[in-house]
A protein has these predicted regions:
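Hydrophobic membrane-insertion alpha-helices, especially the h-region
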Residues: 6-23
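Ser/Thr/Pro/Gly-rich low-complexity linker/stalk segments immediately outside membranes or between
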Residues: 24-38
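Soluble periplasmic/extracytoplasmic beta-strand elements of cell-envelope proteins
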Residues: 34-36, 89-91, 97-103, 117, ...
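Periplasmic/extracytosolic POTRA-like scaffold domains at the N-termini of outer-membrane
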Residues: 40-83, 129-154, 159, 191, ...
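Short, well-structured beta-strand/strand-turn elements
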Residues: 80-96, 168-171
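Short beta-strands and strand-coil junctions in structured, solvent-facing domains, enriched
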Residues: 86-87, 107-109, 125, 186-187, ...
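Extracytoplasmic segments of membrane-associated envelope/inner-membrane machinery
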Residues: 100-181, 187-188
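Extracytoplasmic/luminal low-complexity segments enriched in Pro/Gly and acidic/polar residues
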Residues: 194-235
């Protein structure tokens, strides 16, 4: 029995020593971080080089670091300051290289007066120096409280091939929202930013039924303000 207890004790000491030594080797291992540590090959608004240089400027990473000095939380927190990025995840990969996964926000509407975009959540995205996304444009003054609503309108338009190809831009007279089609002279009076999907669906059904008729060609304004109604005002 004593021999068995002694054997277990020796084994436990060896195991603990091995774990301590392994951990010591890990935290004192050099890791090399470069632009290839950043994972995302489909960026459109910012480059991996820009992200890498931003992290270096913020002292979140260096070209070579001890594992002990790598602060994964700091990397993720600094990346939150890049408004092009929606999510980041920093972790150790196989054999301990640092992996920095990032995902990009997707603009759905361009706010012309303010010179920025909104994504589908209503988050502000700065203009990019490397790309100009083709999204619906909005002209007019916008209350920041309506960012989510106008972003929802933009997202609904950009998610539908008919709306995306049919509408030219959105504008506001500070009271109501209007939409201008690409191929027609009339204006769509959208009204307030409510019942967005329902209003657009009503318009799509109306257009499908009337696109070949004179009522479309003779229209000056198409009113979507009222529930389940499409009212045509002729020239």
């Amino acid at each position: 029995m004593k021999m068995k207890i002694l054997t277990i004790s020796v084994f436990s000491i060896l195991l603990l020593s091995s774990m301590i030594f392994s951990n010591y080797k890990h935290v004192n291992r050099s890791v090399y971080i470069n632009v290839n540590s950043i994972v995302n090959d489909s960026l459109t608004l910012i480059t991996k080089d820009s992200v890498f240089n931003f992290l270096k400027k913020k002292n979140a990473i260096k070209d070579s670091m001890l594992t002990l000095d790598v602060d994964l939380n700091k990397i993720e927190n600094e990346l939150k300051n890049i408004d092009y990025l929606k999510m980041s995840n920093a972790f150790y990969g196989i054999n301990s290289p640092v992996v920095i996964q990032i995902s990009e926000r997707s603009p759905v509407i361009e706010i012309k007066n303010e010179n920025f975009y909104l994504d589908n959540e209503g988050i502000i995205i700065s203009k990019s120096k490397i790309n100009s996304p083709k999204v619906i444009a909005f002209f007019g003054n916008l209350d920041s409280l309506n960012n989510k609503k106008i972003a929802r309108l933009g997202n609904t338009i950009m998610s539908d091939d008919f709306f995306k190809n049919h509408f030219n831009y959105v504008f506001s007279d500070s009271l109501e929202i209007y939409i201008k089609p690409k191929l027609y002279d009339y204006v769509i009076e959208f009204g307030l930013l409510d019942n967005i999907e329902s209003k657009l669906t009503n318009y799509k059904l109306f257009y499908a039924a009337k696109s070949e008729s004179n009522s479309i060609k003779e229209a000056e304004k198409i009113n979507l303000k009222f529930t389940n109604q499409v009212i045509v005002q002729k020239k």
